[in-house]
Design a protein with these regions (language model features):
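ATP/Mg2+-dependent ligation/transfer catalytic cores
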Residues: 1-205
């Protein structure tokens, strides 16, 4: 096995011995069978910007194969305000490369992000991912450059003021404990994100 893959915090990558982009349906089925996974979640963003979820209990091998192959029908008019009820049939199909073991589920659960397709089996042109793809292509056509981006997660932790080693406003950039608070919370979040397949450059305290 590639040692880089063996050391991956992504549990599926480490177990299957291949990068997530190479995951196949057979890989997903194998991981589910060999790791006692009891549920599968399909997750997909809607027009309100929130992530929606469909939960599947794994009844048998045939059922698992069916949902991984065909996805599931959803009501597009309840997900996007611009889709009318009369033409609202959409399908969500899992992207195997996004599979991750849900760290918060009490029942062993494998989750995957999904893509939208219309009733004729074509990708939904107005879906968030295809809107971004079209914007990237337009950017490339106009500038000749490739659009690349990284996300940055920032948050506040609201808690009573610490009496010992109080933090100083506008002086917390890259600060360490005990002056920076809740470092364990940040590192635990980073570990969960990495286990789910997120590629993290670094984490640090802010000002």
């Amino acid at each position: 096995m590639n040692r880089d893959l063996e050391m991956s915090p992504n549990r599926l990558v480490a177990y299957l011995g291949k990068p997530c982009k190479a995951f196949t349906k057979a890989d997903i089925v194998r991981y589910i069978k060999e790791n006692g996974i009891q549920m599968v979640n399909f997750m997909y963003p809607a027009g309100d910007g929130r992530l929606k979820t469909l939960n599947f209990v794994i009844n048998n091998a045939a059922y698992l194969d069916a949902i991984l192959t065909c996805g599931e029908r959803v009501d597009g008019s309840s997900l996007f305000p611009f889709i009318e009820a009369g033409s609202s049939d959409l399908y969500v199909l899992p992207r195997f490369s996004t599979a991750f073991l849900d760290p918060f589920a009490e029942i062993p659960t494998l989750s995957m992000l999904c893509s939208y397709f219309n009733k004729d089996g074509f990708p939904l042109e107005s879906s968030p991912e295809n809107t971004l793809r079209k914007a990237c292509r337009a950017f490339n056509d106009v500038t000749g450059m490739e659009f690349q981006a990284m996300g940055e997660l920032e948050y506040y932790v609201i808690a009573p003021d610490a009496e010992l080693f109080p933090a100083t406003d506008q002086k917390g950039y890259h600060e360490s404990a005990p002056y920076a608070k809740f470092n364990e919370f940040r590192t635990q979040c980073m570990a969960y994100i990495a286990q789910a397949g997120g590629e993290i450059k670094y984490g640090h305290s802010e000002v």
